Design a protein with these regions (language model features):
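N-terminal targeting sequences that direct proteins away from the cytosol to non-cytosolic compartments
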Residues: 1-149, 156-167, 176-221
Length: 221
C-alpha cells in the first residue's frame, strides 16, 4: 500500500475526532519502490522512492542507533521515549518553481509539513509557526556537479491527540528531484532542543536525495 501525494491545502475548521485518527496513518507522499527494509545498516536508511514524474529517487540519511524505524510504508525514525524523530515527505513542486528548489516559497514547505492529513496537522491546524533560519546550500554529487538544498529551522505549536499545545523545534532539508520536493524533517520537543541540537543537526545534514540513472534498453540490430 502506498501513500497518495501530499495535498498542501490547509484545513480551516476544528480537529478531527480521535476515533477517526486512530484508523488512519499520516500521509507523507512517500511511495517506496521496494518491499524490503530500507535499513542499509543500523542507523542508516538507504531506499528508493517515486518522484512526481515517475522516476526513481535514491534517498539516504543517518540517525542515532537508539532510534527505531517505524513500521509501515513511510520513512520515519524516532526515539519513542523522548519524542525525537526524523521523517521524509514527498510533494509535487509548484508549477512556477520550474524544478528549482531555490524558487519554491518557504511557505510551501510549511503547508506540506502541516497538512491536515499529516503528522502534525492531524489534530488541528498549526497556526503558531515560525521560520527562524533559512538558506540554500549546494552539495556535491558523485558526478562532481552540485545540487541545491533548502535548509530551514522552525518552531511551532502542534496540537496533541488530547488537544494540548506543545512547542516543538525542527530542522528541514529539502531538494528537488523528478518534479518533486523531497522534504526531510528532523525535530524534537522545544525543551530538549539545546540538549540534542548537535544530534539533530547531524541527522539533518546527512540527508541526500538524488535521481537514479536507469540504463536504456539495448537497441536491436
Amino acid at each position: 500500500m502506498t501513500n497518495a501525494p501530499v495535498q498542501t491545502t490547509v484545513r480551516a475548521n476544528g480537529p478531527v475526532s480521535t476515533r477517526a485518527l486512530l484508523k488512519t496513518r499520516a500521509v507523507t507522499g512517500v511511495e517506496r519502490l521496494s518491499a524490503s527494509s530500507p535499513l542499509f545498516r543500523p542507523g542508516q536508511v538507504l531506499d528508493e522512492v517515486r518522484a512526481a514524474d515517475g522516476s526513481a529517487v535514491s534517498v539516504s540519511f543517518a540517525f542515532p542507533r537508539q532510534w527505531v524505524l517505524a513500521e509501515g510504508p513511510n520513512l520515519d525514525v524516532r526515539d519513542v521515549k523522548e519524542s525525537d524523530s526524523a521523517f521524509l515527505l514527498v510533494a509535487p513542486l509548484p508549477a512556477d518553481a520550474r524544478g528549482s528548489i531555490e524558487a519554491v516559497p518557504e511557505s510551501f514547505f510549511l503547508d506540506v509539513l502541516f497538512a491536515p492529513q499529516g503528522k502534525y496537522g492531524a489534530y488541528g491546524a498549526v497556526d503558531e509557526r515560525k521560520i527562524t533560519q533559512s538558506r540554500v546550500v549546494s552539495l556535491p554529487l558523485p558526478s562532481g556537479e552540485k545540487q541545491a538544498y533548502r535548509r530551514m529551522a522552525i518552531s511551532f505549536f502542534p496540537l496533541t491527540y488530547n488537544q494540548n499545545l506543545v512547542e516543538r523545534r525542527a530542522l528541514i532539508s529539502a531538494t528537488a528531484v523528478g518534479g518533486s520536493a523531497l522534504i526531510f524533517v528532523t525535530g524534537c520537543l522545544a525543551n530538549r532542543y539545546k540538549k540534542v541540537n548537535e544530534v539533530l543537526r547531524d541527522v539533518h545534514e546527512s540527508f541526500r536525495a538524488t535521481g537514479t540513472v536507469r540504463r536504456k534498453p539495448a537497441s536491436t540490430p
